Amino acid sequence: MAKKSMIAKQQRKQKFKVQEYTRCERCGRPHSVIRKFKLCRICFRELAYKGQIPGVKKASW
């Protein structure tokens, strides 16, 4: 889990647009966030396996 102070810092309006970054809405992780779902890869995988994300299913070939 991310520190509450870091989450609060990220949510503030940044002075420059390039300083803004995405964070997982579920756990607060700043890296490997899938923008469409606003989730990190770990949370995305957990929710996809449980079937809680509509339209997403495990790939098999």
Curated annotation (Swiss-Prot):
Q: Which gene carries the instructions for this protein?
A: rpsZ
A Pfam family this protein belongs to? Ribosomal_S14
Describe its assembly. Part of the 30S ribosomal subunit. Contacts proteins S3 and S10.
List the GO cellular component terms: small ribosomal subunit
Q: What does this protein do?
A: Binds 16S rRNA, required for the assembly of 30S particles and may also be responsible for determining the conformation of the 16S rRNA at the A site.
Q: HAMAP family per the record?
A: Ribosomal_uS14_2_B
UniProt remark on cofactor binding: Binds 1 zinc ion per subunit.
Protein name, entry field? Small ribosomal subunit protein uS14
Carries keyword Iron-sulfur?
Answer: no
Q: Which SUPFAM superfamilies match?
A: Glucocorticoid receptor-like (DNA-binding domain) (SSF57716)
Keyword line: Metal-binding, Ribonucleoprotein, Ribosomal protein, RNA-binding, rRNA-binding, Zinc
Q: Which GO terms describe its molecular function?
A: rRNA binding; structural constituent of ribosome; zinc ion binding
Binding positions for Zn(2+)? 24, 27, 40, 43
The record's comment on protein family reads: Belongs to the universal ribosomal protein uS14 family. Zinc-binding uS14 subfamily.
Single Gene Ontology BP annotation = translation
Q: Which cofactor does it need?
A: Zn(2+)
> At the top level of its lineage, which domain of life is listed?
Bacteria
- Originating organism: Macrococcus caseolyticus (strain JCSC5402) (Macrococcoides caseolyticum)
- InterPro entries from the xrefs? Ribosomal_uS14 (IPR001209), Ribosomal_uS14_bact (IPR023053), Ribosomal_uS14_CS (IPR018271), Ribosomal_uS14_sf (IPR043140)
Gene3D superfamilies found in the cross-reference section: 30s Ribosomal Protein S14, Chain N
